[in-house]
Each structure stands twice: as C-alpha cells, then as structure tokens.
C-alpha cells in the first residue's frame, strides 16, 4: 500500500470522532494567567492548545508555515465544541486542528515521493513526520484521529531514516508483564560500539520529535541516541504511566548489553520535562548502569505537589497529565492526590545522596519547573551541576544550553 493510500485509509470517515478538548472531563478552573515557557510554548487567547513555536521551529518547521496552518484553523466557520476556541472544530474536516496539520504533512509527503535526491527526499519525509506529530499534539489517550496521525508520523520517520546520514535501527524491547515496546537507535557514521544517550521525552511529545537533538548535538560528538515513547503514547501506548515512571526505560537499560552497536559501559540519560522524572529515578535505581544524567526543565516535585503551582498551569497541560495517568473523568482533587505520588521527593528519592553525576538546566520563572527543582536534583548528586538558561533571546539560548549540556554528557561518556 502506498503512503498516500495509507493516509486515505486511516482518515476515511467512519463515525463522528471525539474532539480533542473534550477527551478529559475535569472541572474547569476558569480564567488562568497567561503562560510562556521555552519548552512548552505559550497560551494564546482563544486556543485550547499551547502554541509551541520554538520547539516546532527547532524541529524544522518554517514559522510562516505555522502561521498559514493557524490561519486556516481560525478562518473556518465549521461547528466547534467551544465557539471561543479556534482549535475545537468537530470532525475531520477543514478547520480541525488534526485535519489542517495532517493536510500540510501530506504536501511534504508528496514532495518526498517526487524527489529523486535521496537526502532531500529524507528531509521532506522528516518534515512530514514532524507535521503529523503536531497534528496529533497533545497526544491525548482516546483521540482516534491523533493516533492515526501518529501512525503516519512513524511511517514517515522510518522513510526519512532510510535516506538521512548515519543509520537508524528500529529496536524491540521485551517488558515482562505486558506488550513489547519499540525504540529507535540513531547512530552516527563509524564503527561501534558507541557511547549512548537514552532519551526520556516530555509527556506531550513523541520519540520521533527528537531527531534535531541527535543530528545537531549528539551525532557530531559520535554519540548514539536511543529513544522510546513515554508510557501511554505511541509505541508504548499499551503501558499506563504509573508511580514507577522509569519502568520501561529501566528494562531498555538492562537490555543494552545485548545491543552490539551500544557500549553499555558508557550510557547516560537525558530527560526533558517529565522525562527528567524518569531520568532522575534511573540515576537512583540504576546508578551502576549510568555514567551521567542530564535534565532540562525538570518536573520532579513542585508541579506534582504544589496546588498553587498547578493552578498556574494551562488546562491543556493538566489534561495531558490526567490522560497519561488514565484519569479522564477524575475530579481535580483526585488528580492532585495522584500527582503528589509522582513527586520524587515524596517517593523518598530526591534529597537522598545519589552517586550518579547529575546536571539540571532551568529557566527563571518557569511555571512548570521552578529553580528549586533543579537545585534539589543537583544538590542530591555527589557530582551536581546547576545550569541557568537565560530566557531571551529564546532560540539562541536554547541552542547554547543544549550545547553545554551535551558537552557535559560527552565528558562523562567519552
């Protein structure tokens, strides 16, 4: 079946699909203060989703393309779940968030199929994969159309990997008590085994969102990047996120001695946002297997345990947390009680001495991850490093921060 035919088959209308903003039914807090964050984007009036321009541009999307798709959504006069929110158009049709971003992805998919130059074709496939992921964002459980977009993103990513420099292998890892999970091993040119970074992504992202991290920061240093999806999404969708948040990543770590391209004696973990919760747990529970752990904007304690902090967070992000925990119909009080159990301080880990070197990068006044969380991580480590990243200019400082973090990882691996 051709890629185009697959798109038509997956998105063929069968019934009235639920609209994304209705999937998690919590009590709405009402008006919230505006939020701006380097890693998560910002709240914009009349949008349910946070608009994450920095990360989308960092992944290779042109700012004009983002505005074009947003304009098509805004201009639609189709029925919406909430007339005050542009991105709540019901059904797979013009103006619907998933429809418009997937339509844009198909344009690049067609360019990729028509392009004869393998590397340029690979770039187009990667662009399509990124757009399909934005279509599926924020990846809520039970969002049928989003899950179809994720499937197309994975297919496009596999096509891109066959054409881009280096080698990418799709790996299957067995996890006792449930379904196996799939990861992607990104390898630079040269002879292995290579030092390796295990990527622990955020809850609102897919493992295929981090190719830019590999290409710009790890590959030039001769470091392999291994990704898996977080529990409850993508290739890990059959696994629910639990208080043992690092379960899947632990089983992957334990399997690395059997992966011939990986030097299992030189492995680090890198966690974005809630992925830092996973990475720091690994630092404590699997310290003999890890040379270092790095975190960026970590969600390890305050957001999970502080009600005032939770009140400052956009509805969409709370919906993501509720979705990952399988609490689609829970009250806000029940969600707060459950989130508290995910705090690594409450679990008795953070605050105890950890032998693994840990770095944590943060932005001042980050609504998701205050400086105190990063200080808690680095002060708990026998070899801790605290890294403040200035907010403006956002893109340049984000790049500079990543360069410093990957340089720190390299020193501990190579």
Swiss-Prot record:
Identify the EC number(s).
3.1.1.1
Which InterPro entries does the entry link to?
Answer: AB_hydrolase_fold, FrsA, FrsA-like, FrsA_esterase
Asked whether the UniProt record includes RNA-binding among its keywords, one would answer no
Q: What GO MF annotations does this protein's record show? A: carboxylesterase activity
Tell me yes or no: is Hydrolase among this UniProt entry's keywords. yes
Query: What enzyme class is recorded for this protein?
Result: hydrolase
Q: Which Gene3D superfamilies match?
A: alpha/beta hydrolase
Which is a Pfam family this sequence falls into?
FrsA-like
Q: Which reaction does it catalyse?
A: a carboxylic ester + H2O = an alcohol + a carboxylate + H(+)
Q: Which domain of life is it from?
A: Bacteria
What keywords would UniProt list here?
A: Hydrolase, Serine esterase
Family in the record? Belongs to the FrsA family.
Q: Which HAMAP family match?
A: FrsA (MF_01063)
- Give the protein's biological function: Catalyzes the hydrolysis of esters.
NCBIfam families cross-referenced by the UniProt entry: PRK05077.1
Annotated protein name in UniProt = Esterase FrsA
What is the species of this protein? Shigella boydii serotype 18 (strain CDC 3083-94 / BS512)
């Amino acid at each position: 079946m051709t890629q185009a035919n697959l798109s038509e088959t997956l998105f063929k209308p069968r019934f009235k699909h639920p609209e994304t903003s209705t999937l998690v039914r919590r009590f709405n807090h009402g008006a919230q203060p505006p939020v701006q964050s380097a890693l998560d984007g910002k709240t914009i009036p009349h949008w349910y989703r946070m608009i994450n321009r920095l990360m989308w541009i960092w992944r290779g999307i042109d700012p004009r393309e983002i505005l074009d798709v947003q304009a098509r959504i805004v201009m639609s006069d189709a029925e919406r779940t909430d007339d005050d929110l542009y991105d709540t158009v019901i059904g797979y049709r013009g103006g619907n968030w998933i429809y418009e971003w997937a339509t844009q992805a198909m344009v690049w998919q067609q360019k990729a199929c028509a392009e004869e130059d393998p590397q340029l074709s690979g770039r187009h496939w990667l662009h399509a994969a990124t757009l399909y992921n934005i279509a599926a964002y924020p990846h809520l459980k039970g969002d049928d159309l989003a899950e179809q977009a994720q499937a197309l993103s994975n297919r496009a990513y596999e096509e891109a990997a066959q054409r881009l420099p280096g080698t990418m292998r799709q790996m299957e890892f067995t996890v006792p008590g449930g379904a196996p999970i799939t990861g992607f091993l990104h390898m630079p040119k040269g002879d292995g085994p290579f030092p390796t970074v295990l990527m622990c992504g955020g809850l609102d992202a897919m493992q295929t969102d981090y190719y830019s991290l590999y290409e710009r920061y790890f590959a030039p240093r001769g470091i392999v990047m291994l990704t898996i999806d977080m529990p409850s999404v993508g290739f890990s969708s059959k696994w629910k996120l639990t208080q043992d948040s690092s379960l899947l990543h632990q089983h992957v770590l334990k399997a690395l001695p059997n992966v011939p391209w990986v030097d299992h004696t030189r492995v680090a973990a890198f966690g974005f946002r809630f992925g830092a919760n996973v990475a720091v747990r690994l630092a404590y529970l699997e310290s003999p297997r890890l040379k270092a752990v790095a975190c960026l904007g970590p969600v390890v304690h305050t957001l999970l345990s502080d009600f005032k902090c939770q009140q400052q967070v956009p509805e969409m992000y709370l919906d993501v947390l509720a979705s990952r925990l399988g609490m689609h119909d829970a009250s806000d009080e029940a969600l707060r009680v459950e989130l508290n159990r995910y705090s690594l301080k409450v679990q008795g880990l953070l605050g105890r001495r950890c032998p693994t070197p840990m770095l944590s990068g943060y932005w001042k006044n980050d609504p998701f991850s205050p400086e105190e969380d990063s200080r808690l991580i680095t002060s708990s480590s026998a070899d801790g490093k605290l890294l403040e990243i200035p907010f403006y200019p956002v893109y340049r400082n984000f790049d500079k921060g990543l360069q410093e973090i990957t340089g720190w990882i390299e020193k501990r691996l190579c």
